[in-house]
Amino acid sequence: MTNSGYNSSRLGFKGVEDLGGGLKAKFWLEAGVNNDDGSGSATNVNNQATGGALAGMNGSQGLTFNRTSYVSLIGNSGEIRLGRDYSPQFWSFTVYDPFGTNGVGTTQALNSSAGGVTIVRASNSVAYISPNMSGFVVWGQMYFGENASNAASQAGDGGAARVQYDNGPLSLAAAYSKTTTGAGTDVQSTNIAGSYNMGVAQLIGFWNKDANTGAKDVTGYTIGALVPVAPAGTVRVSFSNSDNGAGAKTDKFALGYVHDLSKRTALYGTFASLSNSGGAAQALNGAITPANGSSTGFDLGVRHAF
């Protein structure tokens, strides 16, 4: 048994205070919860692969606000955030994947495996999010590894930017991030995505590239659709490909259905199949998969939000 096959299980607190004159103060604290066993999830304090995590996932650290922990000021000119938050380039992974970033259907793990520690979230960040400007929203972020100024490496320092355009049924986005990983090394992530809602179906496309210093570029793409089934169901389907630039490739197909019992409760089921070639050994949700092997997986569950 596992959790978060449809949405990530979480417990959080957020609030907004009206300061007057069009200015608001906001806070957001959100902790990941593994509701199948009651454990919490580790956070990362310095955006680095070593020395950053408080403990291994599901470890003795208990509950941490690993998902979100920031304060912000919001005004007519946009929002400024300080703390731990999503990386702007990650947002397209969840917006433009029919399966979001959860369960056997998602391609997030498949197509961001080379993106480094800050591929999803960054600690010690300063971000600006613009207001909607004729359909355009711009999101810029800088984050820091909190190393000594004279350290040989400024690992964990970096930045990201994202622009999204929405106009009726059309949605487009592009994003880029760069994070220092060591002395003279970094990881750069780029993605371009879009969707078009035809009414009978929402068509979705996504492309990404991760570039690590001294390694081949890893590229991937996803095409898929969301098909509403009246009155309370949605069929989800996607095909994805990942290529590590050295001949290792992975193809993945996913098909799922979500049935809303109410605004807060839904039943879901997903089937996914993955195949590797050229020495690739990608897996579904950690399943043991040998090089050039394949795996299949199923999700059946219930999501309740409160």
Model region roles, listed by residue range:
Residues 3-6, 61-63, 118-120, 153-155, ...:
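Short sequence motifs at beta-strands and strand-loop junctions characteristic
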Residues 24-28, 79-83, 137-139, 171-173, ...:
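Residue-level detector of the transmembrane beta-barrel scaffold of outer-membrane proteins
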Residues 55-57, 148, 210-211, 241-243, ...:
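Extracellular loop and loop/strand-boundary signature of outer-membrane beta-barrel proteins
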Residues 154-260, 272-273:
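Detector for outer-membrane/organellar transmembrane beta-barrel domains
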